[in-house]
A protein has these predicted regions:
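Short, charged/polar "capping" segments at the starts of alpha-helices
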Residues: 161-162, 190
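Helical scaffold of the NTase/Pol beta-like nucleotidyltransferase catalytic core
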Residues: 1-132, 166, 170-180
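Conserved catalytic core of two-metal-ion nucleotidyltransferases
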Residues: 172-209
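Flexible, glycine-rich phosphate/dinucleotide-binding loops
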Residues: 74, 136, 189
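Mature, function-bearing regions of proteins
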Residues: 87, 202-220
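Polyanionic, low-complexity intrinsically disordered segments
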Residues: 220-227
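Active-site nucleotide-donor binding segment shared across nucleotidyl transfer reactions
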Residues: 117-150, 154-160, 169
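Conserved beta-strand segments of the P-loop GTPase G domain that flank and frequently precede/overlap
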Residues: 66, 155-156, 183
Length: 228
């Protein structure tokens, strides 16, 4: 796997060797229910991927990932940060692929996701599914519940187009009583909350795998126009 091609929110699947190694790492660090859930995440036959995350300093042959178990532990998700060796990664899946996948609707969050995917397909939008909904679509495991929000990723739209799509997505969210959060992905690797672009400010917060920066909104709008 070419690590340089990875972007925020990408799903990376470890090999059986990688899972076995990470399982041992966390069994040495955790106890009780947390150790049990960690062992489940890193079972050889587990379908739970890691989510690419930002890390301060890492060698070139390591991929920083975050793993989540669908079961709550002490009232919250068990979130584990891990370092996977590049050679231990066997599959990559981008959030945009999840929007084209078939999935069972078990919660309002996924019902909203289904409606959003249909809307995006009709308009040929490049839209991706993130967060708990993305993990449930990717794995078939119950990551969403009655309180889940729907996190989305989109690219290839000008500011005006983005605002039109954002309005439609908020209407879908209202219909299913689900909060929808939309992030736009720029070609330079930065992700920006769409809602920030519509606020009367001169700057927005941009997040990439390398850093977090305050970006000039004018510059971001120019990039969006070039990508549309």
């Amino acid at each position: 796997m070419d690590k340089t091609q990875l972007k925020r929110h990408d799903l990376v699947y470890p090999s059986s060797i990688g899972r076995a190694r990470l399982k041992q790492v966390f069994l040495n660090e955790l106890t009780g229910e947390k150790a049990f859930l960690a062992a489940d995440i890193f079972r050889v036959d587990s379908v739970i991927p890691g989510i690419v995350r930002r890390a301060e300093v890492l060698s070139a042959d390591v991929i920083p990932l975050g793993f989540v178990h669908p079961q709550l532990c002490e009232g919250r998700r068990l979130r584990l940060t891990a370092e996977l060796e590049v050679g231990e990664a066997v599959k990559l899946k981008r959030p945009y692929e999840l929007a084209a996948a078939e999935f069972k609707v078990s919660t309002n969050c996924l019902a909203a996701a289904q409606a959003v995917c249909s809307y995006a397909a009709e308009r040929r939008l490049k839209l991706g599914i993130l967060g708990s909904a993305g993990l449930e679509i990717a794995t078939g495991l119950p990551f969403t519940n009655s309180e889940s929000d729907l996190d989305l990723l989109i690219t290839g739209l000008s500011l005006q187009q983005l605002q039109e799509v954002y309005t439609e997505l908020q209407a879908i969210g209202k219909k299913f009583q689900v909060d929808i959060d939309l992030e736009t992905e720029l070609i330079n690797g930065y992700g920006i909350k769409a809602a920030e672009l519509f606020q009367p400010t001169q700057t927005v917060l941009g997040k990439s795998l390398q850093d977090v920066q305050i970006l000039k909104k004018k510059t971001v709008v120019e990039i969006l126009s070039q990508e549309a």
